[in-house]
From Swiss-Prot:
GO cellular component, one term: myosin II complex
Similarity section: Belongs to the TRAFAC class myosin-kinesin ATPase superfamily. Myosin family.
Protein name, as recorded: Myosin-3
Ranges in coiled-coil conformation: 840-1933
Assembly with partners or alone: Muscle myosin is a hexameric protein that consists of 2 heavy chain subunits (MHC), 2 alkali light chain subunits (MLC) and 2 regulatory light chain subunits (MLC-2).
GO biological process per UniProt: ATP metabolic process; muscle contraction; skeletal muscle contraction
Gene: Myh3
Residue ranges with Polar residues bias: 1269-1282
Residue numbers spanned by region Actin-binding: 656-678, 758-772
Role played: Muscle contraction.
Localization in the cell: Cytoplasm, Myofibril
Sorted UniProt keywords: Actin-binding, ATP-binding, Calmodulin-binding, Coiled coil, Cytoplasm, Methylation, Motor protein, Muscle protein, Myosin, Nucleotide-binding, Thick filament
Domain annotation Myosin motor: ranges: 86-779
Length: 1940
């Protein structure tokens, strides 16, 4: 209970909502004695407050508050609640729950103007008959987001709870506002709509749907009410603003809870009120609003006056209502029309047609002289009417008086009488008004449909309340029937479903029958041969009248149905023809005019004029009306069956059934409106009236079940998640605990009453109020946790601040110490000297540093300029990419919203599917009810015949009557026997077709037979009771006549007593036999149900496994689709690669014509080449990731196939076992069926005999008792009636036990529905998981996009470098064209190499395409299989398919982005190759350039240029050093980039593993959810045939998959052989390369020896010794740098050896390089021979050697580049690390030897010339480089060999796995074929059984028709006997009156 401060938020409404604290304190302090204060039954006020004065002798003396003394029985005294419970807000919390306590609580609250009160789960509201300030905006804000217990009772609280339930439970809600007419339903409906429009407003007032909208959606929803009330509300006897139509307003909300749209459905407009009203009533408000003259332009427009009495149609009752201001209401209506967007033309047409209806009532007609035909009496009114309707007045009058009627194929003009014309005018008026109203509703719905995305809706139902008028017609019957159905829905929801929920969840609960079943009255109205059925039947007969309709009602129901009675005649009251006992009271109905109202005929000639009217609205209203003329003109148009005769009652029932279906799909919230008094007096309450409504509405029963039961329930998982915070230690982290056990531990650890909750199978149930307590405890716990968290955070922040303060303190101390020390020494002389000298010491060094810094500054400035330009360019690209990224994000966001909408629509469809399944079950139950009714009617006919025979014959003919009854009994027994056989056969067929899963046989044997027998007994007893009561009345009125027959009765009495004793003895024997048979039958039924459940469990397991197979196959299809997309992407990449290879070849042809390039450009190209290699590594890593994913998927596929094979084996074994058990069960079932049939037959016979004898015994006993009572002055009548009442109560108890059995039988169905709901929740969770997976995919897409952007930048840089290289090539082309001619042969060789590479690439592309084609075929087959397997799911989940389509579209978008990325990577790869080719050609051009320089130097041979040459070479060496320094920097940068890439790669691999684990979890969850759903879907009848087709297709698919696996295995074997051949070739090539390298080393040593001998003769070279030493130092540094570069290249090799596809090509290139090295060795040998033969040509030989060395260097560098490419392809071969270490040591030793020899060569070369020494040193360095490159290539070749060995092992393992899979699939195919054969055999058996049952059914149908003929004959005899009985009764009444 909130305090006064908390209630201040409600403003002035607070006193009207809740008691103040002062009042509560005063109530608690009032004196109260629980023993004496009480309520007592009072004849005046039903109940009165009083005090107990005394109690003695079974009587209690009570003194009331008005000082009256009453003496009553103890059962008439009720306990009173303590004063603190006065005006309690929830009556379920009352200590003593009884009728007076509820009544006085409502009365006390009503006196204080607190009109809303909770009553358990629903709300009760009392009409205040005055305005209260409880609907203001402050009150709306006060209730927004409040829980029910946090705010006082109010309609806003109910609305907010429904709104919150919709958001949290994601379920449609409904608010049912019910009550009698005048109880305030319409007002509360408007308040609900006001609340939703306020709290869920869209928030954008400026946004309009289109140009038609004059207001926001909230304004339009609110404005719809005034317009509908104006045209659909009217004053009645009990209500000034009564809704004369029903409406169901659906308010739709979007995903965020904002208003999305709304729509309105209307039901049964009371159109008869347009032309007729009672005296105390009036017509619809719109007529009087128009006549109020608030808008004079309407008076002129409609040609009317302001006096309502000028218009008979609207002035038959009252014309003014005190509580309604028609003038203001007209303004509100007109404003609503504008807000709702009606066009001016539509608005004008609306008013015109309303005015035309008023004018219709003034049209007068008279009879022609000497004729019966009518003619117009004046045309003025007709002219006005025709003007408003856009017609010709003469045509209108002619059509009314002389309509055209179709006779045969011709039309004739028929004359009408005056009465006929008036009836036609009335019908047309009502039709125009009704169609106008329906069009208006449709137009409002169009305006409220905003096309915004919807998610859920809240429906508000406002139906006309229960009506009891003086004159009640067909409209009142429809309204009251609707309220009867709604009350039945309420009872079922509150009492039946609630208790069935307890049973289903396994909670200990005793079923309570509250006696609220309204089925009798509902069946009387709507069932076959009910009131509506007879009404429609009479409407089909042309000569039927209201009297014939009344007679049929009497014949069918009078005396047979307790709810149908003949009304009592009351003087001064309108004549009534029959009475119905409704839940709210007895209503007298008059059938006058019912046939005409139901048929609703119209003058078709006038309707034809309407269709051609110039008033567009009128023509539109009747555009679809099918007249006879239209039918004649459109003979070929197909007409819907029955459309020509759609009665009002049939349309009403159709709409009502639709409404009930809508309500069943929602979560209802009930609001019960109460009328306090009949006089509309504010504050007054009539106890009897309110008590009657409370009893009828089930308020007390609802409170009881709320108190006794467990109204609050939560799923275990939700409870664990929400309330775990109460005691987290009870549920430890990191440990799996079942949700149910966790909830049990959690609740056990909390200090609450453990009797206040129960644990069900899936939920935990709470008593009323306990959940609120838990919420308060949770809020307190959260407050403590948040407070503690805040304290920890604040402490941490302060500690951080303290540490900063301490650091500042220490810094200050340090600064102070240094300053003090400086101040102490700054005046010291030596320190001054130090200050002066120190700057001078650094001046020289500073100048050098300044010079260096200036140079660096200039370089930095240039680089800054370049970087600035590049930065601007990148910024522009960044802006573009950011824009693209934003667009993509918007697109992804839109797609995600659409995805969520599609998921919600999918959920709604699934729910709709479940609802349809529930409807199917209901239809089945209805069919069973129909069969029961048929049996009931047959039994009733038989009893009527017995009755008639008894009345017809004298008591002396009792034996003849018994014989006749026996004969009819045997005939009926035969009929029941046939029907029983038919039902048993049908049940067996249904059970087999649904895999014997439904326990219909049990329901048929145990429930239907027993229920039918017991209901027959109960009906016979009730019939007996009514008959005896009637006989009592007759005997009382004819007592004197009975005295005359006393002598005869005495004689018959003695005879009957003898018969009675015999009958009693036979009855006892029969009852004993019946009990024994019942026990045996129940035992057999129990055994059968156990066997049936066991079979169903086994079959369910089989279906689950089969569905799991289907789901795995669907998953395989998805994986194959992904593989196919990957393969397609690769094929595209390969194609682009081939294109780039051709372009590269063209560029190579052009570049080979060019000359050399400088060493600076070479270094730049090396740098670019390194960048290209990095980008290519990234590309290859991405490719490897894709390949790893494919390999993982394949492995998963193989594992899944293995599991499937094992499961299929298990299934086969289980199936065989089940089939064996099934055959055994079938035999047992047949035996049991035969025994049950025999038992049921004997049971039925015995029961028939028993009932007959009971009837005879009861009649004899009644006659005997009546005789005795007449002799003893009726003193024994009371005791006899009490005895009969006891007997009936015993029978009612038996009926209750039967009902409890029925509830248990229904429990299975409700449990299935609950399981489906649970599965739906699990599927929602799975979809949420998929949404998370989608987000991760989007994240991957973003990463790929970023990678794409980086690659775009790299591409741009490559293009710039390429353009620069092309410009340089163009410069050198003109200079070295002559050299290009000499290199034609080399060009041809390069072309051959490129051609060979192209051919290999094409072969690989063809192989990939072949695989893609194979996978495409496999995909198509799998798709076909999946489409067939999932046909049932797709039928129910069409929107889910749309969702999947959207997902695939999104995947395509991702694939496109991946494709773009791969294209860019392919472009980079091509550019990389192009750059390598350019680098190679640049090396060649450089060599040519150096050769030309050497030749120039040789021709001149001038010694004077030697020193200049040395200087030039020195400068070149310095430049090379700088270049080496730059390369060192670039190497370090590349190492950093390499480390970053490695980290990114590791993160990507971790993310991939995480995603794979997530996918596995999702797959498992999906498999579980889908298996559960499929298990339920598999219960449908059509599943057997579908499974047969599916298994056949599965066999075909498996066969295709087997073929595909065989082909893939062959392909793997072929690849294995090819790889083995390649490996052998690689080994041979490597051995050749090793030998050639050894030979090269040997040749090199011999050349060096020769150089030593030669250099001994070069004495003049001693002058350059110092220079050579310097050069030697430079060479050493260069060697160290080259060694570091070797290490860098080795690291690069280890990072980039992953691309497998180009291995074969690179091996071929290696072979070619070996051949080139062989050629180089040959040239070296030739050089050696030249040196030995001719020392005089030493100079030329040295130059030749230098040229050859340069060529070798070029080839070596090319070999290094190619080796790097090959190493990128062979990364996975890391098993050779030990071998690499050994090779590394050998190489280091070789380098040392070469270095030592180089030193010796330099010492010997001192004697030679400078030029020769310099060239020889150059040659030595080049040979060293060549040797190192060759060693690297050898090492890399060994790596490649290891890699291919491991690859061969992997392929071998994969081939073995494929072989195993093939064997498993073959076994699977064999087993499935066997299964298909068995299913075919079962199908044939089912067909045979169906034919047998069809024959039995036809036979039973024939016998049924014969029985119906006999029943008709008996019915005619009954009618005759009734007539005789009436005559006999009337004669006895006359005699009685004469005696009196």
């Amino acid at each position: 209970m909130s305090s006064d401060t908390e209630m201040e938020v409600f403003g002035i409404a607070a006193p009207f909502l809740r008691k103040s604290e002062k009042e509560r304190i005063e109530a608690q302090n009032q004196p109260f004695d629980a023993k004496t204060y009480c309520f007592v039954v009072d004849s005046k006020e039903e109940y009165a407050k009083g005090k107990i004065k005394s109690s003695q002798d079974g009587k209690v003396t009570v003194e009331t508050e008005d000082n009256r003394t009453l003496v009553v029985k103890p059962e008439d005294v009720y306990a009173m609640n303590p004063p603190k419970f006065d005006k309690i807000e929830d009556m379920a919390m009352l200590t003593h729950l009884n009728e007076p306590a509820v009544l006085y609580n409502l009365k006390d609250r009503y006196t204080s103007w607190m009109i809303y009160t909770y009553s358990g789960l629903f709300c009760v509201t009392v009409n205040p008959y005055k305005w209260l300030p409880v609907y203001t905006p402050e009150v709306v804000d006060g209730y927004r987001g409040k829980k029910r217990q946090e705010a006082p009772p109010h309609i806003f609280s109910i609305s907010d709870n429904a709104y919150q339930f919709m958001l949290t439970d994601r379920e449609n809600q409904s608010i049912l506002i019910t009550g009698e007419s005048g109880a305030g339903k319409t007002v509360n409906t408007k308040r609900v709509i006001q609340y939703f429009a306020t709290i869920a407003a869209t928030g954008d007032l400026a946004k309009k749907k289109d140009s038609k909208m004059k207001g926001t959606l909230e304004d339009q929803i609110i404005s719809a009410n005034p317009l509908l009330e104006a045209f659909g509300n009217a004053k009645t006897v009990r209500n000034d603003n009564s809704s004369r139509f029903g409406k169901f307003i659906r308010i739709h909300f979007g995903t965020t809870g904002k208003l999305a749209s709304a729509d309105i459905e209307t039901y049964l407009l009371e159109k008869s009120r347009v032309t007729f009203q009672l005296k105390a009533e009036r017509s619809y408000h719109i007529f009087y609003q128009i006549l109020s003259n608030k808008k004079p332009e309407l008076i002129e427009l409609l040609l009317i006056t302001t006096n309502p009495y000028d218009y008979p149609f609207i002035s038959q009752g009252e014309i003014l209502v005190a509580s309604i201001d028609d003038r203001e209401e007209l303004l509100a209506t007109d404003s609503a029309i504008d807000i709702l967007g009606f066009t001016p033309e539509e608005k004008s047409g609306l008013y015109k047609l309303t005015g035309a209806v008023m004018h219709y009532g003034n049209m007068k007609f008279k009879q022609k002289q000497r004729e019966e035909q009518a003619e117009p009496d004046g045309t003025e009114v007709a002219d006005k009417t025709a003007y408003l309707m856009g017609l010709n007045s003469s045509d209108l009058l002619k059509a009314l008086c002389f309509p055209r009627v179709k006779v045969g194929n011709e039309y004739v003009t028929k004359g009408q009488t005056v009465d006929q014309v008036h009836h036609a005018v009335n019908a047309l008026s009502k039709s125009v008004y009704e169609k106008l109203f329906l069009w208006m509703v449709t137009r409002i719905n169009q305006q409220l449909d905003t096309k915004l995305p919807r998610q859920h809706f809240i429906g508000v139902l406002d139906i006309a309340g229960f009506e009891i008028f003086e004159y009640n017609s067909l409209e009142q019957l429809c309204i009251n029937f609707t309220n009867e159905k709604l009350q039945q829905f309420f009872n079922h929801h509150m009492f039946v479903l609630e208790q069935e929920e307890y049973k289903k969840e396994g909670i200990e609960w005793t079923f309570i029958d509250f006696g609220m079943d309204l089925a009798a009255c509902i069946e009387l109205i709507e069932k076959p041969m009910g009131i509506f059925s007879i009404l429609e039947e009479e409407c089909m007969f042309p000569k039927a009248t209201d009297t014939s309709f009344k007679n049929k009602l009497y014949d069918q129901h009078l005396g047979k149905s307790n709810n149908f009675q003949k009304p009592k005649v009351v003087k001064g009251k309108a004549e009534a023809h029959f009475s119905l006992i409704h839940y709210a009271g007895t209503v007298d109905y008059s059938v006058s005019g019912w046939l005409e109202k139901n048929k609703d005929p119209l003058n078709e000639t006038v309707v034809g004029l309407y269709q051609k009217s110039s008033n567009r609205l009128l023509a539109h209203l009747y555009a679809t009306f099918a007249t006879t003329d239209a039918d004649g003109g459109k003979k070929k148009v197909a007409k819907k069956k029955g459309s020509s005769f759609q009665t009002v009652s049939a349309l009403f029932r159709e709409n009502l059934n639709k409404l009930m279906s809508n309500l069943r799909t929602t979560h209802p919230h009930f609001v019960r409106c109460i009328i306090p008094n009949e006089t509309k007096t504010p504050g007054a309450m009539e106890h009897s009236l309110v008590l009657h409504q409370l009893r009828c509405n089930g308020v007390l029963e609802g409170i009881r079940i709320c108190r006794k039961g467990f109204p609050n329930r939560i799923l275990y998982g939700d409870f664990k998640q929400r309330y775990r915070v109460l005691n987290a230690s009870a549920i430890p982290e990191g440990q799996f605990i079942d949700s149910k056990k966790a909830c049990e531990k959690l609740l056990a650890s909390i200090d609450i009453d453990h009797t206040q909750y129960k644990f069900g199978h899936t939920k935990v149930f709470f008593k009323a109020g306990l959940l609120g307590t838990l919420e308060e405890m949770r809020d307190e716990r959260l407050a403590k946790l948040i407070t503690r968290t805040q304290a920890v955070c604040r402490g941490f922040l302060m500690r951080v601040e303290f540490q900063k303060m301490m650091q500042r303190r220490e810094s200050i101390f340090c600064i102070q110490y240094n300053i003090r020390a400086f101040m102490n020494v700054k005046h010291w002389p030596w320190m001054k000297l130090f200050f002066k000298i120190k700057p001078l010491l650094k001046s020289a060094e500073t100048e050098k540093e300044m010079a260096t810094m200036k140079e660096e500054f200039q370089k930095t400035k240039d680089e800054l300029a370049k970087s600035e330009a590049k930065r601007k360019e990148l910024e522009e690209k960044l802006v573009t990419l950011v824009q693209e990224k934003n667009d993509l994000q918007l697109q992804v966001q839109a797609e995600s919203e659409n995805l969520l909408d599609a998921e919600e629509r999918c959920d709604q469809l699934i729910k709709a599917k479940f609802q349809l399944e529930a409807k199917i079950k209901e239809v089945t139950e209805r069919a069973e009810d129909e069969e029961e009714i048929n049996a009931e009617l047959t039994a009733k006919k038989r009893k009527l015949e017995d009755e008639c025979s008894e009345l017809k014959k004298d008591i002396d003919d009792l034996e003849l009557t018994l014989a006749k009854v026996e004969k009819e009994k045997h005939a009926t027994e035969n009929k029941v026997k046939n029907l029983t056989e038919e039902l048993a056969g049908l049940d067996e067929t249904i059970a087999k077709l649904t895999r014997e899963k439904k326990a219909l046989q049990e329901a048929h044997q145990q429930t239907l037979d027993d229920l039918q027998a017991e209901e027959d007994k109960v009906n016979s007893l009730s019939k007996l009771k009514s008959k005896l009561e009637q006989q009592v009345d007759d005997l009382e009125s004819s007592l004197e006549q009975e005295k005359k027959l006393r002598v005869d009765l005495e004689r018959n009495k003695r005879k009957l007593e003898g018969d009675l004793k015999l009958a009693q003895e036979s009855i006892l024997d029969l009852e004993n036999d019946k009990q024994q048979l019942d026990e045996r039958l129940k035992k057999k039924d129990f055994e059968y149900s156990q066997l049936q459940s066991k079979v169903e469990d086994e079959q369910t397991l089989s279906l689950q496994l089969q569905k799991k197979i289907k789901e795995l196959q669907a998953r395989i299809e998805e994986l194959e689709e992904e593989i196919e997309a990957e393969r397609a992407t690769r094929a595209k990449t390969e194609k682009q690669r081939s294109d780039y290879a051709r372009e590269l070849e063209e560029l190579s042809e052009r570049l080979e014509e060019a000359g050399g390039v400088t060493s600076t450009q070479i270094e730049l190209n090396k740098k670019r080449e390194a960048e290209f290699l990095k980008l290519r590594r990234d590309l290859e890593e991405a490719t490897l990731q894709h390949e790893a994913t494919v390999a993982t998927l394949r492995k998963k596929h193989a594992d899944s196939a293995a599991e499937l094979a094992e499961q299929i084996d298990n299934l086969q074994r289980v199936k065989q076992k089940l089939e064996k058990e099934k055959s055994e069960f079938k035999l047992e079932i047949d035996d049991l069926s035969s025994s049950v049939e025999s038992v049921s037959k004997s049971k039925a016979n015995l029961e028939k005999i028993c009932r007959t004898l009971e009837d005879q015994l009861s009649e004899a006993r009644g006659k005997n008792e009546e005789t005795q009572r007449s002799l003893s002055e009726l003193t024994t009548q009371k005791s006899r009636l009490q005895t009969e009442a006891g007997e009936l109560s015993r029978q009612l108890e038996e009926k209750e036990s039967i009902v409890s059995q029925l509830s248990r039988s229904k429990q299975a169905f409700t449990q299935q529905i609950e399981e489906l709901k649970r599965q739906l929740e699990e599927e929602n969770k799975a979809k949420n998981a998929l949404a998370h997976a989608l987000q991760s995919s989007r994240h991957d897409c973003d990463l790929l996009r970023e990678q794409y952007e980086e690659e775009q930048e790299g591409k741009a840089e490559l293009q710039r470098a390429l353009s620069k290289a092309n410009s340089e090539v163009a410069q050198w082309r003109t200079k070295y064209e002559t050299d290009a001619i000499q290199r034609t042969e080399e060009l041809e060789e390069a072309k051959k190499k490129l051609a060979q590479r192209l051919q290999d690439s094409e072969e690989q592309v063809e192989a990939v395409n072949a695989k893609c084609a194979s996978l495409e075929k496999t995909k198509q087959r799998l798709q076909g299989e999946v489409e067939d397997l999932m046909v049932d799911v797709e039928r129910a989940n069409s929107l889910a398919a749309a969702l999947d389509k959207k997902q695939r579209n999104f995947d395509k978008v991702l694939a496109e982005w991946k494709t773009k990325c791969e294209e860019s990577q392919a472009e980079l790869e091509a550019a990389l190759k192009e750059s390598r080719s350019l680098s190679t050609e640049l090396f060649k051009l450089k060599n040519a350039y150096e050769e030309a320089l050497d030749q120039l130097e040789t021709v001149k041979r001038e010694n004077k240029n030697l020193e200049q040459e040395i200087a030039d070479l020195t400068e070149q060496i310095a430049e090379n050093g700088k270049s080496i320094h730059e390369l060192e920097k670039s190497r370090k940068q590349m190492e950093l980039e390499k480390a970053d890439i490695q980290m990114a790669l590791e993160e990507a691999e971790a993310a991939l593993e995480h995603e794979e684990a997530k996918i596995l979890r999702i797959q498992l969850e999906l498999t579980q959810v889908k298996s559960e759903i499929d298990r339920k879907i598999a219960e449908k009848d059509e599943e057997i045939e579908q499974l047969k087709r599916n298994y056949q297709r599965t066999v075909e698919t498996m066969q295709g998959a087997l073929d595909a696996e065989v082909r893939s295995r062959n392909e793997a074997i072929r690849l294995k052989k090819k790889m083995e051949g390649d490996l052998n070739e690689i080994e041979i090539q490597l051995s050749h390369a090793n030998r050639q390298a050894a030979e090269t080393i040997k040749h090199l040593r011999s050349v060096q020896g020769q150089l030593k001998d030669t250099q001994l003769h070069l004495d003049d070279a001693l002058r350059g010794q110092e220079d050579l030493k310097e050069q030697l130092a430079i060479v050493e540094r260069r060697a160290n740098l080259l060694q570091a570069e070797v290490e860098e290249l080795r690291a690069t090799l280890e990072q980039t050896e992953r691309a497998r596809k180009l291995a074969e090509q690179e091996l071929l290139d290696s072979n070619e390089r070996v051949q080139l090295l062989h050629t180089q060795n040959t040239s070296l040998i030739h050089t050696k021979k030249k040196l030995e033969t001719d020392l005089t040509q030493l100079q030329s030989e040295v130059e030749d050697a230098s040229r050859d060395a340069r060529n070798a260097e070029e080839k070596a560098k090319k070999a290094i580049t190619d080796a790097a490419m090959m190493a990128e392809e062979l990364k996975k071969e890391q098993d050779t690390s030990a071998h690499l270490e050994r090779m590394k040591k050998n190489l280091e030793q070789t380098v040392k030897d070469l270095q030592h020899r180089l030193d010796e060569a330099e010492q010997l070369a001192l004697k030679g010339g400078k030029k020769q020494i310099q060239k020889l040193e150059t040659r030595i360095r080049e040979l060293e480089f060549e040797l190192e490159g060759e060693q690297k290539r050898n090492t890399e070749s060994v790596k490649g060999l290891r890699k291919y060995e491991r690859r061969v092992k992997e392929l071998t393992y994969q081939s073995e796995e494929d072989r195993k899979n093939v064997l498993r699939l073959q076994d699977l195919v064999d087993k499935l074929q066997v299964k298909v054969k068995s299913y075919k055999r079962q199908a044939e058996e089912a067909d045979e059984q169906a034919n047998v049952h069809l024959t039995k059914f036809r036979k039973a149908q024939h016998e049924l028709e014969e029985a119906e003929e006999r029943a008709d004959i008996a019915e005619s005899q009954v009618n005759k006997l009734r007539a005789k009985t009436r005559d006999f009764t009337s004669s006895r009444m006359v005699v009685h009156e004469s005696e009196e």
